[in-house]
């Protein structure tokens, strides 16, 4: 007579090794979901370094399980579960990133004056570095416009460039 144990297919050692981290991941995700109670919350009791470490551990665990394709049905369920958990928990920024962002936003319009030249510091916004070039192009354009003017152009040009705020025109431009 054959025993029922001998009829059962045995799982290879690789599946057992993959099942224990899978169990740990499911326990971790169940613990996070139990604390959530239906609405995503932030881990408020953790320091920023601890939040970043927790995020990295969850990310590493999810990526390691998603790379193992032993069971396609389980990997699809794990993938959905990992994406759901990763979507609920916002990724904490490192402290250096926050400091750099604040420093950039505060100092982006500052310039360093060395002697007679205006040297733009490295934290200036890239678009603000183009302002001197725009001024040079505008001056070149006005020089070209002056060369090709008719006798009547100076009257209308004076009105548009030197119009007083109160609406009156000076005697030189009439």
Curated annotation (Swiss-Prot):
Compartment annotation: Secreted
Signal sequence segment: 1-34
Superkingdom classification of source: Eukaryota
Post-translational modification Methionine sulfoxide, affected residues: 139
Keyword tags: Amidation, Cleavage on pair of basic residues, Neuropeptide, Oxidation, Secreted, Signal
Gene Ontology molecular-function annotations: neuromedin U receptor binding; signaling receptor binding; type 1 neuromedin U receptor binding; type 2 neuromedin U receptor binding
Tissues/organs with expression: Expressed throughout the enteric nervous system with highest levels being found in the jejunum.
BP GO annotations: eating behavior; energy homeostasis; G protein-coupled receptor signaling pathway; gastric acid secretion; negative regulation of eating behavior; negative regulation of gastric acid secretion; negative regulation of gastric emptying; neuropeptide signaling pathway
GO terms for cellular component: extracellular region; terminal bouton
One Pfam family per UniProt: NMU
InterPro entries: Neuromedin-U_amidation-site, NMU, NMU_C
Asparagine amide: residues bearing it: 166
Propeptide regions on this chain: 35-103, 170-174
Entry's family note: Belongs to the NmU family.
Protein name in UniProt: Neuromedin-U
Organism in which the protein naturally occurs: Homo sapiens (Human)
Source organism phylogeny: Eukaryota, Metazoa, Chordata, Craniata, Vertebrata
């Amino acid at each position: 007579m054959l025993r029922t144990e001998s009829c059962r297919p045995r799982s290879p050692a690789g599946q057992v090794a993959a099942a224990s981290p899978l169990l740990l991941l499911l326990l971790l995700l169940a613990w996070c979901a139990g604390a959530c109670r239906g609405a995503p919350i932030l881990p408020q009791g953790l320091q920023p370094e601890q939040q970043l470490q927790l995020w990295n551990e969850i990310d590493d665990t999810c990526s390691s399980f998603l790379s193992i394709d032993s069971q396609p049905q389980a990997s699809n369920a794990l993938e959905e579960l990992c994406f759901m958990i990763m979507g609920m928990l916002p990724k904490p920024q490192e402290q250096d990133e926050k400091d750099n962002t604040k420093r950039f936003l505060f100092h982006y319009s500052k310039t360093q004056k060395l002697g007679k030249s205006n040297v733009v510091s490295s934290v200036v916004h890239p678009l603000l570095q183009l302002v001197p070039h725009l001024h040079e192009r505008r001056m070149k354009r006005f020089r070209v416009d002056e060369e090709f003017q008719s006798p009547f152009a100076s009257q209308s040009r004076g009105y548009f460039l030197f119009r007083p705020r109160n609406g009156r025109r000076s005697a030189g431009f009439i």
